A protein has these predicted regions:
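ATP-binding/phosphotransfer module of carbohydrate and carboxylate kinases, centering on a glycine-rich
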Residues: 1-61, 66-71, 76-112, 117-137, ...
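Residue-level signal for well-ordered, solvent-exposed loop/turn and beta-edge residues enriched
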Residues: 106-107, 163, 232
Length: 416
């Protein structure tokens, strides 16, 4: 028996996928322009687009005057981003965010629950699915309107199996997150490391649309990173890759939650900074901080430091006590040094930084100064702050589902 040829059905779905990716990248286009970009006949593209309109995947969106042809207008088509909805879940050590979005990453509704680490992971995940169902009910959405659920979690994740291998600060053992959630929700579930998921969000919705090889660095509450090579997330052996938070910066240093000693996180995570500031704390050495906390150093928490970072130019970081500035400058220098070392090894086209610490203008400016001190080529043209930072709690989970079950799938009909 001869080798089977390429299925015409697969060709159709591949072409649909290419159309969706093109519209996602360029916005509304005419059938004629799509045909030119894809190298297909206008008739073939018209058939594809008409089928996608019938499936409610794309919609016609007005007209555009053709150049050089008076009176002739192009009818534009664009993605119907509301044809299905996505639930994005971001599990962090303290809180878990649940957000309903459309395929474009538009936020419809969200809720926040405490990440209960006292309960078993399975019981917590059952509670999570109940909250998801409540949120969907409040939005009058049925399960069949859901494209899938994207779950982002810190630490090491086996995406293929939907398993959290080690969620630092949340669960120490393996948890079959995908299996538990999909059993209760009866829909596709993708589980991924939070930084890798955010990188997918950037590739689909942000600066990553224009670059093939990139490095992503997150600071706050811990330190995370992800590598994109050839527009694909790089995954190393045993699902480890670019764990710069666990780069050794202090031999025989403080024990890290990963089990090693002297990791970058032990010096610069927000929890580590809170402990170091407590050690510096006194009315004489830190008068402003002393006044701010009413003489109670136990008020120096991860939440307080995060609030300082989020306030911006008017916050405490802009007018720190000298002793506090010493601590913060040391942390920023370490972050910059490790970032420069990683950029030197990987030589990405761009580095995108995000997270509450690097969103703060004062901290980011200092970070860039240290980067340029080590290498003058590391300017704002090479290192960018993410424009999606305000969507950090959901854009990664949305991208996981949208990319896999919509853009790579030629829409929704193949799965259904």
């Amino acid at each position: 028996m001869g080798k089977p040829g390429i299925s015409l059905e697969n060709v159709k779905y591949n072409n649909k996928s290419e159309i969706l990716k093109m519209l996602q990248k360029n916005g509304a286009m005419s059938r004629k322009d799509i045909a030119v970009h894809m190298g297909l006949t206008p008739a073939a593209v018209t058939l594809l687009c008409n089928a996608m309109i019938e499936e409610n995947i794309i919609v016609e969106k007005g007209e555009l005057q053709e150049e050089k042809r008076a009176g002739r207008r192009k009818v534009l088509v664009d993605i119907n981003y509301d044809c299905k909805y996505i639930v994005s879940v971001s599990i962090e050590a303290v809180d878990t965010w649940i957000t309903v979005t459309n395929i474009k990453g538009g936020d419809l509704a969200s809720t926040k629950i405490a990440t209960d680490t006292i309960k078993s992971p399975e019981d917590f995940l059952k509670d999570l699915t109940k909250e998801i169902k409540i949120l969907l009910w409040e939005q009058e959405l049925q399960l069949n309107e859901l494209l899938g659920i994207g779950i982002c979690i810190p630490g090491i994740v086996n995406r293929k199996k939907g398993i959290s291998i080690h969620a630092y600060g949340i669960w120490d053992d393996e948890v079959e997150v995908g299996k538990v959630v999909s059993e209760y929700m009866q829909c596709p579930v993708i589980v991924e490391n939070n930084v890798k998921a955010f990188a997918e969000g950037e590739m689909l919705y942000g600066a990553g649309k224009s670059g093939d090889n990139m490095l992503f660095i997150k600071w706050g509450p811990g330190v995370g990173s992800a590598i994109v090579i050839g527009n694909e997330l790089y995954e190393g052996y045993q699902h480890n890759a670019a764990e710069i938070g666990h780069y050794i910066v202090e031999p025989n240093g403080i024990k890290c939650r990963c089990g090693r000693h002297g990791c970058l996180e032990t010096r610069v995570s927000i929890s580590a900074l809170a402990e170091r500031l407590k050690n510096e704390y006194s009315e004489e050495r830190t008068p402003q901080l002393y006044k701010l906390t009413n003489g109670d150093k136990e008020k120096i928490t991860r939440q307080l430091i995060t609030e300082w970072a989020e306030v911006g130019e008017e916050g405490y970081f802009a007018q720190m006590d000298p002793a506090v500035e010493n601590v913060m400058s040391g942390a920023v220098e370490r972050m910059a040094r490790v970032a420069v070392n990683v950029m030197t090894i990987l030589a990405p086209e761009h580095t995108i930084v995000f997270g509450p610490m690097l969103e703060n203008t004062h901290i980011y400016k200092l970070f860039m100064e240290y980067c340029r001190e080590y290498d003058e080529h590391y300017t704002d043209e090479y290192i960018h702050r993410s424009k999606l930072s305000k969507k950090i709690s959901y854009i990664g989970g949305t991208a996981l589902i949208a990319r896999t079950y919509f853009f790579e799938n030629g829409g929704i009909s193949k799965k259904e």
